[in-house]
C-alpha cells in the first residue's frame, strides 16, 4: 500500500509546532483510491466477525461508517466531551501533543458485544488505547484495532492490548 502515500499530504507544525500532520482528505476525494483501502480492511475485519465498529472522532468516523455499512453491522461513535446526548462514560488520556477526553454513550451496546475499534491513524496509541478502555468500561468485548495509517517510529502498538488484532495498511 506504500504507493498510496502520494495521496497523503504532510502538513508541518499542525496542529502544534513540531508535529507533521498526515492529511488523508485527498484519499477521500478519490473514490478509486479510497475503495482500494476499504476492500482490504473490509476483508480483514469481516474475518473477526464484529457486532460493531467503533469510530473515533472525527476522522475515524469517515471510514468506520463506510466499513459498518459494507459489513452490515452497527456503528458506535466515540466522541470528544459534550457531543453525545444522554448518559455517557468518559476517560481522559494523553495525546502526542497534549491531553484530551473521550466519551461513549452508556448503553450504546449490548454487554459483551464484539467491537472492532477504527481510527484513521495510529501515532502514540494514546487515543486508541483510551478508546479501547472505554469500550471495555461500557461492557463491550474489544476484539481488535484497525487503522489506515501508522506512524511506526512513535511505537503506538506498544500502548495497545498486544493480545488483540491490530491492522494498519500504510506505514510511515
Swiss-Prot record:
The protein's annotated pathway: Purine metabolism; AMP biosynthesis via salvage pathway; AMP from adenine: step 1/1
Family, as annotated: Belongs to the purine/pyrimidine phosphoribosyltransferase family.
Quaternary structure (record): Homodimer.
Localisation per UniProt entry: Cytoplasm
Entry protein name: Adenine phosphoribosyltransferase
Cellular component GO terms held in the UniProt record: cytoplasm
Organism: Prochlorococcus marinus (strain NATL2A)
Catalytic activity: AMP + diphosphate = 5-phospho-alpha-D-ribose 1-diphosphate + adenine
Gene3D superfamilies: 3.40.50.2020
Gene: apt
Function in brief: Catalyzes a salvage reaction resulting in the formation of AMP, that is energically less costly than de novo synthesis.
Keywords: Cytoplasm, Glycosyltransferase, Purine salvage, Transferase
Alphabetical GO biological process terms: adenine salvage; AMP salvage; purine ribonucleoside salvage
EC category name: transferase
InterPro entries from the UniProt entry: Ade_phspho_trans, PRibTrfase_dom, PRTase-like, UPRTase/APRTase
HAMAP family xref list: Aden_phosphoribosyltr
EC number(s) on file: 2.4.2.7
Secretion signal, residue range per the UniProt entry: none
